[in-house]
Amino acid sequence: MYKKVDSSKSFVDIERDVLKLWHEKEIVKKSFNSNQDGEYFSFYDGPPTANGRPHVGHIITRVMKDLIPRYKVMKGYKVPRKAGWDTHGLPVELEIEKKLGISGKPQIEEYGIEKFVKECKESVFSYVSLWKDMSEKLGYWVDMENPYVTYHNDYIESVWWALKQMWDKDLLYKGHKIVPYCPRCGTALSSHEVAQGYKDVKEATAFVKFKVKGEENKYILAWTTTPWTLPSNVALAINKAYDYVEVINNGEHLILAKALLTVLEGEYEVVSEFKGEKLLGMEYEQLFKFANPDKKAFYVVHGDFVTLSDGTGIVHIAPAYGEDDNMLGKKYDLPLINLVNGEGKFVDEVEPWKGLFVKKADPKILEYMKENGTLYKSEKFTHSYPHCWRCDTPLLYYPRDSWFVRMTSLRDKLVENNNKIHWYPDNIRTGRFGKFVENVIDWGISRDRYWGTPLPIWQCECGHRDCVGSIEELKEKGINVPENIELHKPYIDEVKLTCPKCGKPMTRTEEVIDCWFDSGSMPFAQLHYPFENKEVFENTFPAQFISEAVDQTRGWFYTLLAISTSIFDKSSFENCIVLGHVLDKHGLKMSKHKGNVVDPFDVLDNQGADACRWHFYTSSAPWLPTRFSQEDVAETQRKFLSTLWNVYSFYVLYAEIDKFNPNDYKDFVSGNVMDKWIVSRLNTLTKDVGNYLDSYGITQAALEIQDFVDDLSNWYVRRNRSRYWTQELTDDKVGAYVTLYRVLVTLSKVAAPFIPFMTEQIYQSLVTSINEGAEESVHLCKWPEYDESLIDSSLEEEMKLAISIVKLGRSARNGANIKNRQPLYEMRVSTKALPDYYGDIIRDELNVKKVEFGADLSKYVNFEIKPNLPVLGKSYGKLIPKIRKEISSMDQMKLAERVRSGEAVKIDVDGTEIELNSENLLVTMQGLEGFAFAGIGEIGIVLETTITDELREEGYLREVLSKVQNMRKESGFEVADKIEIYVSGNEKLENVIRKFEDTIKKETLATDIIYSENKEAAIYNINGEELNVFVKKNC
């Protein structure tokens, strides 16, 4: 009837079987097409770049993104799940440069832009088969047959439409600014790209002496972390509100901030002290004479950004290489001296270092200044410096003509929209993301590269500019535009427009746009909106759920918000789970260099998807760093998946023996207390998991399921095994079967979004195998409805207390080194009495004859109370020895009871009144001789550990039963097989066996016990006594 559980199959084998089933029955497709009349639930899949291999970080994003849409489908929502691929930009171009053995823009242009772009286009799906394979094995259900692709014309056209909207709102402009610039890639970068590439570097700084003009031996001492910018110096900045001094140091007069005199070496004498304002206008001699400025230069100016945190309180100013410097240069009309070319190398005018990359020139510049006496000193300084997020080259702040989106004009709206987003964790709103938004600068979107969405702006030599927002507009305004125009360079560059002002041809500006603009446009561009799918867009915008790694606070999350705010005046997403980084098993960042990278395919092929998924759901909150290794995933598999699988296997094994069909008992209601309890727990679970998932509490929901499975296996099934072993199909046995069946079926649905493979296998075996009209897959089922009338909170609380008491009893046994199979006489419990039913359970579980509730444990326990030094020591450090003495002089039991009850106890030590409580005292309790104690919170138990002869005999009996049952299992006997038992070699134990012979036969299905030797017998240690035992199947 049920599908037999094949013990030879691993979980990975089972997952392969499930994948085959999904393919054969087109389950994924049916899931996508389900709930067509339902309310939309919108989810956006952030596009990865498919020209690189997937890594373990992509597993966590996929398992988190997969769960919520699965749950919403089961709740009846219509959930479009469109996959996407990010195909433009530097990541692709750099790979092609490596492939072709070329480097940099000159070599690309020598190779040929058209050929280079074709190579880029052909490469973007190099690893798509690996991505699809990983996603399929992981059970990540998104539509990969009809993905959005950022290089497709339809997608680009939608991006052009967005840029046109910005153009019409005067948000798009061209400016000459200092921008973060990658000399290796030859292009400017945006602030959010820069934010992803900061690294702590240790570099040489320079304390430089600028000779005061007209003074023989007087210098202004300035400090810089970028010596390469010194040849372009045109001014020095001070803060006019600070105090400055002139000192004599090593025979030279030096000027610097008073607060930073400690930077000086050797002794010094302060000659005068004055406000910075006195220095304004002071002139000094040009440090390097590689260029002749065309404006007034080389004098002291005021800068608000000058601080006293480092250096000398005097900053050298080179307007060509820094935003603050550039703004100050504009304020004072300073000359801009740029001595660095687009490759980040010094131009020919800088004779000593021409053609040298500026960062490599730093030590040579320092040596040069040391030789000519302008270097006061140089020190190593660790600071955070931006590097290219893709090629790792140190960035330069460099003057460039670039196109910008006027994000500063939208700052208030960005902040307002950010505050409406539900971030998980919440501190992202005001912290990492919020701070970035509050300090937003204009977005430099143009890139001087080749493979990307072309900036759709055409310019005329008369100065007129126009932005094109669609292919139709391009054909209307363009001259001989090809019918099937390819919207990439170099083809689009050949299209000319006629200038409406002067009639001359207009040429497209050469740049492509930031590839992050592509991905941030996906809410509408994936649908080719507004040219198609207007209704679908309106139903799915904004997204109700997105999730990616924390890095995307500077990437996709920002561009989504920036673009949607500028066009639609609101955020494009409502709820976002921000995922933490995946670390190795030691908590270290994974890297090829360290050799600690875990291949996702190794884990999927060895431990399987469900184990992988469950590990990420339960190991920590999604936004915290997660340790990940094959060992960790294997442990997750053993503790949770194996436990659930064993419960399912247990049911199938016995239900098959009894040919039990739950369809014959659809209306059966069990009156058994344990059945009522597990049904109550199941309905509470269904309710709580649904509530957690509705509020994106993935980890809380998963842990609830984990706790339930633990209760189901280690309490319900274990406590009820004997009900399945009875020969007749009594009402009690039917109740046990019906209850476990219903629990497993409902649990398969509740856990389906989390562990889609195992739940499918359980559902297929328990449901589709016996119900022809059932849904084909658990993933096509509706989320189970909980029944409030079946939830008994009192019953759950009572059982929870009973379980806690049992756990404490086991702990006390372990502490006394007494096995659970050894019966004990009595256990005393501090809590109020439970109904008799639970007393029976506790006695049976802990193998004790008697349980006393509401007991006074003080008679059996020794109390020891000590000061909690980290707490008391802070306030009363010197008094601790006397506090300890005072505590030890008090009645320990009474003090412990008062403290445990929450009372504050006051003592006087050397005239100081000190209040003792549960926070500043450590109370430990240990059982007196003959007793074992364990406690937690308000629950305490004491076991009487004295073992009488009668109890010892019962202990022997339990051990013999355990050994025989294990021998049955190891011999491969079926559950219903009858056996014969041979025992010999120990007269004492043989007498015990004779005494309990009927019990042993009943428990082990033995037809006979033979007291004679058998050559094949195994020797067992039975509580210190040796016994020869052999079992054989009774034919």
Swiss-Prot record:
E.C. number(s) listed in UniProt: 6.1.1.5
Q: One biological process GO term for this chain?
A: isoleucyl-tRNA aminoacylation
Q: Which residues bind ATP?
A: K592
Bilayer-crossing regions? none
What keywords were assigned to this record? Aminoacyl-tRNA synthetase, ATP-binding, Cytoplasm, Ligase, Metal-binding, Nucleotide-binding, Protein biosynthesis, Zinc
Cofactors (names): Zn(2+)
Q: Where is this motif: 'KMSKS' region?
A: 589-593
Q: Name one GO cellular component term.
A: cytoplasm
Which parts of the sequence form the motif 'HIGH' region? 48-58
Query: What is any Pfam family matched here?
Result: DUF5915
Which InterPro entries does the annotation name?
Answer: aa-tRNA-synth_I_CS (IPR001412), aa-tRNA-synth_Ia (IPR002300), Anticodon_Ile_ABEc (IPR033709), Ile-tRNA-ligase (IPR002301), Ile-tRNA-ligase_type2 (IPR023586), M/V/L/I-tRNA-synth_anticd-bd (IPR013155), Rossmann-like_a/b/a_fold (IPR014729), tRNAsynth_Ia_anticodon-bd (IPR009080)
The subcellular location is: Cytoplasm
Q: Does the keyword ATP-binding apply?
A: yes
Q: What is known of its domains?
A: IleRS has two distinct active sites: one for aminoacylation and one for editing. The misactivated valine is translocated from the active site to the editing site, which sterically excludes the correctly activated isoleucine. The single editing site contains two valyl binding pockets, one specific for each substrate (Val-AMP or Val-tRNA(Ile)).
Q: How does it assemble?
A: Monomer.
Give the protein family. Answer: Belongs to the class-I aminoacyl-tRNA synthetase family. IleS type 2 subfamily.
The task this protein performs is described as: Catalyzes the attachment of isoleucine to tRNA(Ile). As IleRS can inadvertently accommodate and process structurally similar amino acids such as valine, to avoid such errors it has two additional distinct tRNA(Ile)-dependent editing activities. One activity is designated as 'pretransfer' editing and involves the hydrolysis of activated Val-AMP. The other activity is designated 'posttransfer' editing and involves deacylation of mischarged Val-tRNA(Ile).
| Protein name (database record) | Isoleucine--tRNA ligase
